[in-house]
Amino acid sequence: MGDLAAIILAAGKGTRMKSDLVKVMHPLAGAPMVAWPVEAARQAGTSRMVLVVGHQADTIREHFAGTEQVAFALQEEQLGTGHAVASAAAALDGFTGRVLILCGDVPLIRPETLRGMIDAHGATGAALTVLTTRLENPFGYGRIIRGFDGRVIRIVEEKDATPEERGRREVNAGIYCAEAAFLFDAVTRIGNDNAQGEYYLTDIVTMANEQGLRCTAHPVADPVEVMGVNDRAQLAEAGRFARQRINRELMLDGVTIVDPAATYIDRGAVVGRDTTVHPGVHLSGETRIGEGCTIEQGAVIKGSTLGNGCVVEPGAVIRSCRLGSHVMVKAGSVMEDAIIHDHTAIGPMAHLRPGTELMAHVKIGNFVETKKITMGEGSKASHLTYLGDASIGNNVNVGCGTITCNYDGVRKHRTVIEDDVFVGSDVQFVAPVTVGRNSLIAAGTTVTRDVPPDSLAIARAPQVNKDGWKLKQRDQ
């Protein structure tokens, strides 16, 4: 394929988005819009890329900071696409290969389409190849004008076209492949004598023909690939097509998606074979789902890793977590920055806050909240409990209503519960405190001192029964 560079036009503000955020940075299925053509160009085999930036240039630079092969060119005034490409010339000084030109607001172009255009460009010996498509309603697009031999002789913008030219349905997709020597010479000679007063890149088609160079068209069958995004309605439409593409690829790889139209999976997510994804699920960020999992209705998983055989019930929310294999997350549970080992069950309606680590075969039941704790293998807290700033050993039973009192109004303190401890219901641990292994904490106890191993701790007022008291109260 030879040496290949790409110029991606991303300098426009995007007024029709009616947003404080520059258009090309609006998210599309998990990535800024401009990241899609950047990735397509990378997969097409480019060795160098130049992003032409203008409005909110620093925002775009920051997103791509550290990205290999990406350089930036500043277009301080947006004077048209020809001016934008000319702005990138210095960044490709000395480059003698072929140059792809893409638009940052045309996100759905496929790498395969770009490779096909590059191959056709080389096979025909063209100086310039224009990607085209046919539209039922071509309004707003530049029309392709061909010569008798089928070559492209010029492109006419909508506002400059005659009625006959406006009737043509083959349109310019705004994506090109050009020989670098021709391109960078041509863009220095573009004028702005047109209805918009701009420097149109399309004028280089006429220049190629005037120089006796070949200019060809490479048609793309699916117009969706070259749809532009100018407002939020079009952004939503592009998002729908992007999700269709993502979901179809996953299904062809062995994932069951019950209702693809109602399933929202970002392009960065990976889902293993034989996993079933139900309607209303959102998988976003760098999420990794193992094989044989079940993700039920309305679950939200962001930036998390799930091992094989996990089950996530309806309405669960998992953010920045790492789950082992065969973990059960029951309905309505919320987890953030937690590490969960194999064969552990969470919920329903549990809340695991940052810093939670649960070892294998742990059970966290309904209305249990944890924060900055480790819980050893086989331990369980089945219901109505708060565990914060605690280290809990193996095979510990935490009774209903247990609370670690970890905050004294100034500092947080830790509770340590060693292996094989049984904690009865309605127990408070006033930290800092340590409970030795194999101890029993009686129900209703407030623990304020360390408990030795193999001990019974009981701290509650003795029960007093007053016979006949209720009858005496009634007679008064």
From Swiss-Prot:
EC number per UniProt: 2.7.7.23, 2.3.1.157
Residues binding acetyl-CoA: N406, Y407, S425, A443, R460
Reactions that this protein is recorded to catalyse: alpha-D-glucosamine 1-phosphate + acetyl-CoA = N-acetyl-alpha-D-glucosamine 1-phosphate + CoA + H(+); N-acetyl-alpha-D-glucosamine 1-phosphate + UTP + H(+) = UDP-N-acetyl-alpha-D-glucosamine + diphosphate
Cofactor note: Binds 1 Mg(2+) ion per subunit.
GO molecular function per UniProt: glucosamine-1-phosphate N-acetyltransferase activity; magnesium ion binding; UDP-N-acetylglucosamine diphosphorylase activity
GO cellular component: cytoplasm; membrane
Similarity comment: family membership: In the N-terminal section; belongs to the N-acetylglucosamine-1-phosphate uridyltransferase family. In the C-terminal section; belongs to the transferase hexapeptide repeat family.
Name of the protein described by the UniProt record: Bifunctional protein GlmU
